[in-house]
């Protein structure tokens, strides 16, 4: 049986940063394993498994907020208690082993999955974008996503393509002012659309109508949005950041981090070269098809059984 027990995360995190108490056992009764699916492994007398999605707080502390900066210390404490680690990519697995000195036999990579969304309406996407041709970026606006570089790339691209627009859809996270400043300084700001958070219907519509999908991140432990775009048949340009080469494979065009010129060139090739675009769409669909949530769930279930068996 699985018990999903929501708790007051922040107060407990503050305590678990400093001590291995209180034990989570007091709230959930008898159990074989506790799984913390988002960096935090609650202390327990049973076996522990924690999911580590990335090491932003270690590699790029300037790109992490105060809450996530606490994660490395909590990971170390859990490892000292004997916790197992699930990572969402082989890249992060290697990082966890190297940075924390974790036992390789107790750090297991299981990729995330993607479910194909119902087809969106391109006409709805065009209405949201204010035009039929647009480059799309989806997700929370925060420094790690490096959207100002995308704005600079679009400035170059828009000079060569007068009909193209840039659409950024996602809620403002911390540090979102940098994107606002980049848009305000852009000579192409009239063709840049910021939509804020969108619901699933509008997300699907935006993907259905997009000429290209851009993912210019500085660092990623997995990178689900480009896989979702590939699954929807949208050609993707991403950066060679963190796990993205592993996850995207040959299903995306990859460019160096922070290189607006290279990003603009890759996007231009997609919107200008129909043959390349079609080839990239087909490769992207093949890559995305490998990320199946049912397979992920089976592998995680096997891992939980394995972890539970380590405590008598």
Regions found by a protein language model. Give the residues of each.
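Carbohydrate transferase catalytic cores enriched for Leloir-type hexosyltransferases
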Residues: 1-312
């Amino acid at each position: 049986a699985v018990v999903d027990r929501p708790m007051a995360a922040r107060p407990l995190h503050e305590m678990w940063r400093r001590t291995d108490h209180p034990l989570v056992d007091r709230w959930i009764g008898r159990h074989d394993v506790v799984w913390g699916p988002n960096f935090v492994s609650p202390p327990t007398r049973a076996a522990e498994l924690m999911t580590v999605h990335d090491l932003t707080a270690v590699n790029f502390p300037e790109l992490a907020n105060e809450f996530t900066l606490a994660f490395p210390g909590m990971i170390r404490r859990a490892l000292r208690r004997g916790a197992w680690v699930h990572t969402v990519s082989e890249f992060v697995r290697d990082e966890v082993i190297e940075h924390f000195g974790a036992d390789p036999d107790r750090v297991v990579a299981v990729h995330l999955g993607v479910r194909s969304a119902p087809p969106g309406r391109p006409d709805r996407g065009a209405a949201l974008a204010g035009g039929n041709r647009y480059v799309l970026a989806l997700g929370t606006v925060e420094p790690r996503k490096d959207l100002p570089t995308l704005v600079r790339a679009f400035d170059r691209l828009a000079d060569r393509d007068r009909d193209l627009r840039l659409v950024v859809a996602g809620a403002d996270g911390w540090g979102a002012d940098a994107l606002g400043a980049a848009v305000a300084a852009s000579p192409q700001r009239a063709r840049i659309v910021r939509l804020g958070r969108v619901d699933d219907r509008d997300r699907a519509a935006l993907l259905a109508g997009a000429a290209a999908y851009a993912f210019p991140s500085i660092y990623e432990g997995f990178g689900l949005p480009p896989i979702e775009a590939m699954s929807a048949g949208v050609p993707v340009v991403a950066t060679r950041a963190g796990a993205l080469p592993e996850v995207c494979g040959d299903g995306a065009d990859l460019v160096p981090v922070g290189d607006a010129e290279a990003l603009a060139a890759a996007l231009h090739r997609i919107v200008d070269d129909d043959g390349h675009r079609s080839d990239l769409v087909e490769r992207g669909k093949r890559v995305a098809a490998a990320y199946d949530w049912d397979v992920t769930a089976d592998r995680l279930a096997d891992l939980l059984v394995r972890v539970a068996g380590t405590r008598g």
